[in-house]
Amino acid sequence: REDFQSWFTAEGIRPVKFTRNTNEGRYTATNTYHYMWNAAEPYIAADVYSSSSGQRNVNMPLNACPYDLPALFFLARNMDFDSVVPGKRYPMTFAIDDDIYNVYFILHGRETRKIKGLGTVRTIKFAAKLLAGEVFTGEEDMMIWVTDDDNRIPVWFEAPIMVGTASGRLAEYSGLKYPFSSLTNK
């Protein structure tokens, strides 16, 4: 079970605070980040714990703008995909645990996809680089499909794991800001 929470500015999606609570069987982890933008040398003050590494407090530099995972997904959902070149790698930086990673996403284009429980949906498909670790091999990208409308709701994902593939779908939705216009039929 994973719980990620992110606080960031509306303008520019600049991270302010991030918390992570992970409980996956015998593995547990917590992260609490405070982004210290006003310091002479900006940094992330990170309080990090994992059952495999213990407790530690670290300061990570804010040389670029390392996003946390929820802010990174929010940023990706709000991009102007009409100005993104399909097949081109777009770099992104994010922080997790006590490290900063350089990753990328690649737009694959638009496609219509049947989603169990929803119906047929017009989507935007893109890939995100995965990091090697306890679950992912890091050799393949996670594929993500978001609605091709103003909501940009993630409706499906597939991610290769050590043994097999993890996948997930949107099961239900409510309170959308915009009409679900990419849903072509139920």
Residue ranges and their predicted role:
Residues R1-A39, D80-K186:
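Acidic, serine/threonine-rich low-complexity disordered tracts
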Residues W37-I96:
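Active-site/ligand-binding surface loops and adjacent short beta/alpha elements
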